[in-house]
Curated annotation (Swiss-Prot):
<dbReference type="InterPro" id="IPR042099">
    <property type="entry name" value="ANL_N_sf"/>
</dbReference>
<dbReference type="Pfam" id="PF16177">
    <property type="entry name" value="ACAS_N"/>
</dbReference>
<protein>
    <recommendedName>
        <fullName>Uncharacterized 16.9 kDa protein in acs 3'region</fullName>
    </recommendedName>
</protein>
<dbReference type="InterPro" id="IPR032387">
    <property type="entry name" value="ACAS_N"/>
</dbReference>
Length: 145
């Protein structure tokens, strides 16, 4: 019989009595409960991390909200929830550079999701390179090793 998963060296076929089998099973159950408890605690995040007000007010999302004519952030959020495919398509077109356009914003076949099907972009270009060009270029510090 194989070892019980992540309890190295504990094998039911090495148990000398039914009592040993019971102890091994109990140890496995306790370990599984402990692992589940840790996982469920991590899934219950309730903290909210708010951006500084000036940063939030000047963000790309707020700029987009004003361009689209939404009066409140709540109104925009409700629209985005109902139209999430259109929202993410517009965000990707507006705020990322693409080397090849996508044919479909989302292909959803549970449990699989494919975003921006057929599109090609370069993460380094979008996160670093394009910010080092133009009027708003970021001056990157030179780091010596």
């Amino acid at each position: 019989m194989a070892a019980l998963g992540w309890l190295p060296g504990i094998r039911i076929d090495q148990a000398e009595s039914w009592e040993d089998v019971g102890i091994i099973k109990e140890a496995v159950n306790l370990a599984e409960e402990k692992a589940t408890a840790k996982t469920s605690v991590l899934l219950e995040e309730t903290r909210i991390f708010e951006a500084p007000k000036d940063l939030a007010e000047n963000s790309n999302v707020m700029k987009w909200m004003k361009e689209k004519g939404f009066k409140t952030e709540r109104e925009m959020r409700l629209w985005c929830s109902a139209n999430y495919i259109q929202f993410w398509g517009e965000m990707a077109k507006t705020y990322a550079d693409w080397f090849e356009p996508w044919s479909s914003t989302l292909e959803w076949k549970p449990p699989y999701a494919k975003w921006f099907v057929g599109g090609k972009c370069n993460v380094t270009h979008n996160c670093v390179d394009r910010h080092a060009q133009g009027a708003k270029k970021i001056r990157w510090p030179y780091i010596r090793a």
